[in-house]
């Protein structure tokens, strides 16, 4: 029973472990702001969460908006548009954003390895994660009629290990193109300042991609990949040597990798360890209090019987035992005399009747 109570409290504290990012138009709820995965070992990376309307984030009867997934590469100071979807005529039926929309158009999807699956509660999914997928990912949400957009950032770290090697050539990483920008802070301000479809409103991006929009249903998964014609303005890193002459990075000897893992996993490990210790202490205090509150009562078995002791030894009737040494009271003497007089009078009456 106590084990079940302990598991209940652990699950309760685990259930409230959620991060909420509040924007001007929408709110993002997720259970993780950073992920660490290993190439070859993890076949898929999922960032769980959902977009919500909370608090005073007002809504009309219907709305239109866009969601984009972008990646920032800190090493090369560039960003990539990984996925973008435009939603039209979405009814405000509940707190979930972009649910039950009349139509949705995917207008940017360079490859199908990075996709959102909002109907499954997945903000971002990376299939077959690679070392080049490491970076800061942004989910940008823009609603029509608003003067700014909301961006939500999360970190994804992919490393190779000694036991599980990445079987991706260096050329495969170069296929992922980037667009130069000043720095990450300027890039975030750039995203917030744009309203509406990022690719449609940005002339530079619109010139880079030849968009072929495809209408899809909001009830099915987005799996199509439109064609893109890359122009010369795209920044493609000329030196992207992740393997160091095709030799895999040994995660066990990588100081930076261990620092990253400790940075994101150690706080959670300390949190859960502390909660388990507190639950054990609370359980021990509860058991001690229960034992002190309901002690074992002693059973009365009476005093040892002697020859001169009365026969009554019950704990209940102990106060009613007869004491043979107690003298008669005056009332007892009067009653005795009355009884004797009454007896003599009865005998006298019987004699008179006989005569």
Swiss-Prot record:
Glycans are attached at residues 147, 167, 245, 253. It is a single-pass membrane protein; Single-pass type I membrane protein. GO terms for cellular component: host cell; host cell Golgi membrane; host cell junction; membrane; viral envelope; virion membrane. InterPro entries: Herpes_gI (IPR002874). It comes from the Viruses. This is Envelope glycoprotein I. It comes from Gallid herpesvirus 2 (strain Chicken/Md5/ATCC VR-987). The keyword Amino-acid biosynthesis does not apply. Keywords: Glycoprotein, Host cell junction, Host cell membrane, Host Golgi apparatus, Host membrane, Membrane, Phosphoprotein, Signal, Transmembrane, Transmembrane helix, Viral envelope protein, Virion. Coiled coil: none annotated. Residues 1-18 form the signal peptide. Interacts with gE. It holds the Pfam family Herpes_gI. Its main location: virion.
């Amino acid at each position: 029973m106590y084990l079940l109570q302990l598991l209940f409290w652990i699950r309760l504290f685990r259930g409230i472990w959620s991060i909420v990012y509040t924007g001007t138009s929408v709110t993002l709820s997720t259970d993780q702001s950073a992920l660490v995965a290993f190439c070859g070992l993890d076949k898929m990376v999922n960032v769980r969460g959902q977009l919500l309307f909370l608090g005073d984030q007002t809504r009309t009867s219907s709305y239109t908006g866009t969601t984009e997934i972008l990646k920032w590469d800190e090493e090369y100071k560039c960003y990539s548009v990984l996925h973008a979807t435009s939603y039209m005529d979405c009814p405000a039926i509940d707190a979930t954003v972009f649910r039950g929309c009349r139509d949705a158009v995917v207008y940017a999807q360079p490859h199908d390895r990075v996709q959102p699956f909002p109907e499954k509660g997945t903000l971002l999914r990376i299939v077959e994660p690679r070392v080049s997928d490491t970076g800061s990912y942004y989910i940008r949400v823009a609603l029509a009629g608003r003067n700014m957009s909301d961006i939500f950032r999360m970190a994804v770290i992919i490393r190779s290990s000694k036991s599980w090697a990445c079987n991706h050539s260096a050329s495969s990483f170069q296929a992922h193109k980037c667009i130069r920008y000043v720095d990450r802070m300027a890039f975030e301000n750039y995203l917030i300042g744009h309203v509406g479809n990022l690719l449609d409103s940005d002339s530079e991006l619109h010139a880079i991609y030849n968009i072929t929009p495809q209408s899809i249903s909001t009830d099915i998964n987005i799996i199509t990949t439109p064609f893109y014609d890359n122009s010369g303005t795209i920044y493609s890193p000329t030196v992207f040597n992740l393997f160091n002459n095709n030799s895999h990075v040994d995660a066990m000897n990588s100081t930076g990798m261990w620092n990253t893992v400790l940075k994101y996993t150690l706080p959670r490990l300390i949190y859960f360890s502390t909660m388990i210790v507190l639950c054990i202490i609370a359980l021990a205090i509860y058991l001690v209090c229960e034992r002190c509150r309901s002690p074992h009562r002693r059973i009365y078995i009476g005093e040892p019987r002697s020859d001169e002791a009365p026969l009554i030894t019950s704990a209940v009737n102990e106060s009613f035992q007869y004491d043979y040494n107690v003298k008669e009271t005056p009332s007892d003497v009067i009653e005795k005399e009355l009884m004797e007089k009454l007896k003599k009078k009865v005998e006298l009456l019987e004699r008179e009747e006989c005569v």
